[in-house]
Amino acid sequence: MEGCTTRDSTGLGLGERFNQRGNVFLRLVSHVQCAIKFAKNHNLRLVIRNTGHDGSGRSSAPGSFEIHTHHLKHTHYHDDFQPVGAVTTSGPAVTVGAGVILGDLYAEGARQGYTVVGGVCPTVGFVGGFLQGGGVSGKFSHNRGLAVDNVLEIQAVTADGDLVVANDYHNQDLFWALRGGGGGTFAVVTQATVRVFPDVPCVTTQLAVSAPEGLDDHSWMQVLELLLRGLRSFNEERIAGEFHLRPDPLSAILTLHFLNTSDLDSVDRRLAALIDKFRTSEIPHIYSSKSHALEVPRSVEAKLYASHELTSVQMPVLYSLDPSYKVSYLNMGDPNDADFRNVYWGPNYERLLALKQKWDVDALFITRLGKRHDVMNTIPSTGAGADMRSFNRDIYDLLRNHAEDPRLNEVWTAINTVTEWVDWITSNGARMIPSDIAFRFWMLRVYMTHDWGCGLTSSTAEL
């Protein structure tokens, strides 16, 4: 592997110890090619790792050989991009290396007057699992689609070590699979070219409603119905928004993103109709339209129970209301959902599986929730302790990526000390990945603190 930097957890070279975890930190596409060939020739358990934010544990595995792509940092703006093989151009675009994080991409776009369809966390790698898992954007998707809807071309290294271009003119089947089929499954994506949009202003506002002590359930359901109907009305106008519930104290928060405006008065007028419904509802409540830091229960067990309850009880009830309508997001899914093939891909799974067998004959790329996921069951297990150490390492990387945010320390300590937790999850068939707990804890606590150019209204009122 000349030209690649390799080491394992003991500090010894990979040529000396194959039974230990190996890491290769890549700076060139040629490094990716030789690393893949090395893993294939030595029958190593290969894992593709970018910034380590994957909540399903797909960016790590016990005893694995990890290919790190976060050093592939390059961006190039195109005034009018022409994909390879195309006879026409596709308009303004940006080519993004696999290691470019969203915060840097947004900052570069702000300097040049454009933006991309991306998520809220600035330390997530744009081209990694985020993009390949669909790429939902809370602010932009209602107007501009998912991140994958705006991909024009992908460069990737296949399981054979070949560098290929995938777009609407070359390797169309791989291009289709890489846009939503899941990261680390079909090939190692080294860069992607995506459509860009003018960097327009945006106003983000929140309407918070809390229930006074003693409010009956029926009245609270009426409040929630008003909020949800309001959200649907705004969504129909292509205004993005999210709805959050907090159990203690009982409250609900509606967040809305008004693109292409900086006029706070116009936003207030848009909200007035919804607020008037609360004023005339005769239901006791308190509301405000200011930004709030969302709080979540700190108990690890509580988070595990909530995840299991969502997958096993709440979602099946919702699906039963209309079996023909299902919407799932791979990047935020339960890694242990037994029905993941149907939940995330439905009728597309068989086509994706066929493409997996075409582009990765020997199943070199194996991940949780991925195609040929069954092969993972044949990989020797090193025990629950190794799994815990592996997933705790994900948390360590999250701490590193977020400048060792002290708010994660409590969660990390709890996960390391609650050893019986693993057996409890296994016995109930609802195994949850520690990195997901830490990541969700961090994300919920700082959800509205990163504001990439959007203003926040701050008026308050009480009834």
Curated annotation (Swiss-Prot):
It comes from Penicillium expansum (Blue mold rot fungus). FAD-linked oxidoreductase; part of the gene cluster that mediates the biosynthesis of communesins, a prominent class of indole alkaloids with great potential as pharmaceuticals. Communesins are biosynthesized by the coupling of tryptamine and aurantioclavine, two building blocks derived from L-tryptophan. It is an enzyme of class 1 (oxidoreductase). Residues 16-199 form the FAD-binding PCMH-type domain. SUPFAM superfamilies: FAD-binding/transporter-associated domain-like (SSF56176). The keyword Manganese does not apply. PANTHER family: BINDING OXIDOREDUCTASE, PUTATIVE (AFU_ORTHOLOGUE AFUA_1G17690)-RELATED (PTHR42973), FAD-BINDING PCMH-TYPE DOMAIN-CONTAINING PROTEIN (PTHR42973:SF39). Belongs to the oxygen-dependent FAD-linked oxidoreductase family. Its EC number is 1.-.-.-. Its cofactor is FAD. Keywords: FAD, Flavoprotein, Oxidoreductase. Disruption phenotype: Abolishes the biosynthesis of communesins A and B and leads to the accumulation of 4-dimethylallyl tryptophan (4-DMAT). This is Aurantioclavine synthase cnsA. InterPro entries: BBE, FAD-bd_PCMH, FAD-bd_PCMH-like_sf, FAD-bd_PCMH_sub2, FAD-linked_Oxidoreductase, Oxid_FAD_bind_N. GO terms for molecular function: FAD binding; oxidoreductase activity. Coiled coil: none annotated.
